[in-house]
């Protein structure tokens, strides 16, 4: 039986991962992931486990190489988007990324910011980032993304000082962007 679900998680990767694992516990295996759509087929309850990994900071070549590495380990891997494709033009600048990953387009990693990784459930926790250095690097990537948003909103707030309402709104958005920065820094401190 095929089951189709419409969901949008945005940047809430852990929520997406929990939902996919909940679906697996109910007896559904992911077969396709689109912008908003997830297609599942019936399977034994709890047969699969899922992990979601953020790869938007990688270049197209590095992302493809990482995907092939995971597939070589026996995992099934699906690309997934974070954004909905609502942008000006077909090129996006990612200041937090490395190397050629700073620029994404339809031909590179524009709608391939996440990897959904599936494995057979062996009863062990499923983690892709196992070493402390790996976890720190992963959390720093997320922290830096939100730090970039904070800096942009703070700068725009200063630019629009002549319009107090706009400046206050932009400043408030900047402060909101600091919440995940602090949360990821706390995670880094715990490691």
Question: Can you annotate each of these PLM segments?
Answer:
Residues 1-191:
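Terminus-proximal functional modules
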């Amino acid at each position: 039986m095929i089951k189709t679900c419409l969901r949008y998680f945005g940047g809430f990767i852990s929520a997406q991962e929990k939902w996919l694992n909940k679906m697996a516990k109910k007896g559904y295996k992911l077969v396709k992931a689109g912008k908003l759509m997830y297609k599942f087929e019936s399977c034994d309850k709890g047969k699969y486990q899922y992990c979601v990994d953020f790869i938007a900071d990688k270049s197209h070549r590095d992302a493809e190489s990482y995907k092939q590495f995971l597939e070589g380990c026996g995992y099934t891997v699906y690309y997934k988007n974070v954004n909905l494709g609502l942008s000006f033009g077909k090129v996006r600048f990612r200041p937090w990324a490395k190397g050629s990953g700073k620029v994404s387009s339809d031909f590179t990693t524009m709608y391939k910011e996440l990897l959904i990784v599936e494995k057979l459930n062996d009863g062990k926790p499923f983690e892709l980032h196992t070493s402390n250095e790996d976890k720190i690097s992963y959390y720093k990537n997320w922290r830096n993304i939100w730090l970039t948003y904070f800096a942009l909103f703070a700068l725009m707030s200063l630019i629009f000082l002549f319009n107090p309402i706009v400046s206050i709104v932009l400043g408030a958005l900047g402060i909101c962007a600091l919440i995940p920065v602090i949360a990821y820094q706390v995670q880094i401190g715990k490691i």
